[in-house]
Design a protein with these regions (language model features):
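Bacterial N-terminal signal peptides that target proteins for export
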Residues: 1-9
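N-terminal secretory/targeting leader peptides
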Residues: 24-114, 122-125, 129-325
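Cleavable N-terminal signal peptides
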Residues: 10-11, 21
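Sec/Tat signal peptide C-region and signal peptidase I cleavage site
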Residues: 17-23
Length: 325
């Protein structure tokens, strides 16, 4: 009897082993923003749609708020394959793709519609192609929105109002040069360290889009918000290119289709919620200044454009300007 049972058991085991295991890919998606930010909203939409449309063959695990490292570490992780998908400010990619710095130049995009037209069109896709040689596939350009200045000294009406301020800046050369030109003292700090730096007075001021001010609660340690809108801040959603190519053609299409939808929805929410967030900041005691001399700022920062052109040539800047007309 034991021999019979063993034979039956072996036959059953062989039969089960002949059935292929359900193929499942698990993707790690990382970003640096808090869970209250629209980057998390976008990531959640991406996760839900990918898992539903793939029939469960692709799972997405989200790691917000820098859980897998700061922006530089996340980008390195995505290139090496430790992280599958990362969302980060486009400025964080300019070391790898200097041309992307053209999109970061102050006052490059007078409107969101123009920014979307350029980023989603031939010019943006030309830059997107440059991500592939560094191991990344660009899935889309979500947004942080227009950058504005907060500080504790007073409203910023003209470039002169920034003179002497200890100004936190990101790693964008254009923004570093801009604030140095107008007399501020730019200091690079990771965004994760910024709240404490503002609270303790290590820096006096910073610039971020409204959504980031709200998400990171900078209004708790900053009194004044001036709507300078001095630079449009795009994000880049990237995927390890080998991981993407390792999926089936159908799965790759699901990834790219859903990413495009997620970017569009995130942009729509970003615009729709901006005034609501400004009102929220005012209600919490922040003084909001809308009286900004944009023309004076544009004149003051012209050398930033010239510096970029000296280093990278004028073809991309000229193409953007021509497409803007």
């Amino acid at each position: 009897m034991n021999t019979v049972m063993k034979t039956i058991g072996l036959a059953a085991a062989l039969t089960l082993s002949a059935i292929p295991a359900f193929a499942e890919s698990v993707l790690k998606l990382a970003h640096a923003a808090p869970e209250t930010d629209l980057q998390q909203t976008m990531s959640t939409y991406f996760k839900e749609q990918i898992e539903a449309r793939s029939g469960g063959s692709i799972k997405v695990n989200i790691f917000p708020h820098g859980q897998l490292g700061n922006d530089a570490q996340m980008i390195d992780g995505a290139r090496s394959g430790i992280i599958d998908i990362a969302i980060s400010g486009l400025n964080n990619f300019t070391g790898l793709i200097p041309e992307a710095g053209a999109f970061e130049l102050p006052f490059m995009f007078p409107s969101r519609d123009l920014a979307y037209k350029i980023l989603d069109g031939e010019i943006g896709q030309g830059v997107a192609a440059k991500f592939e040689p560094v191991g990344l596939k660009l899935l889309g350009f979500p947004e942080n929105g227009y950058r504005n200045i907060t500080n504790n000294r007073g409203p910023v009406h003209t470039p002169e109002d920034l003179s002497g301020l200890q100004m936190r800046v990101n790693n964008s050369k254009a923004l570093n040069d801009m604030f140095a030109l107008v007399g501020a003292n730019p200091q690079q700090l990771p965004v994760a360290e910024l709240y404490t730096a503002l609270e303790t007075g290590v820096v006096d001021a910073q610039d971020h889009p409204i959504g980031i001010v709200v998400s990171f609660k900078f209004n708790e340690v900053q009194k004044y918000l001036s709507l300078t809108q001095h630079a449009y801040s795009a994000l880049a959603m990237v995927m390890n290119i080998d991981k993407l190519k390792g999926l089936s053609d159908a799965e790759q299409k699901i990834i790219t289709d859903v990413a495009a939808e997620a970017v569009a929805k995130q942009r729509e929410l970003s615009l729709a919620k901006e005034e609501e967030m400004i009102t929220e900041l005012e209600s919490q005691g922040m003084t909001v200044n809308r009286d900004v001399d944009a023309a004076a700022f544009q004149t003051a920062v012209k050398p930033v454009w010239e510096g970029f052109i000296d280093e990278n040539g004028d073809s991309l800047v000229n193409a953007i300007v021509a497409a803007s007309k």
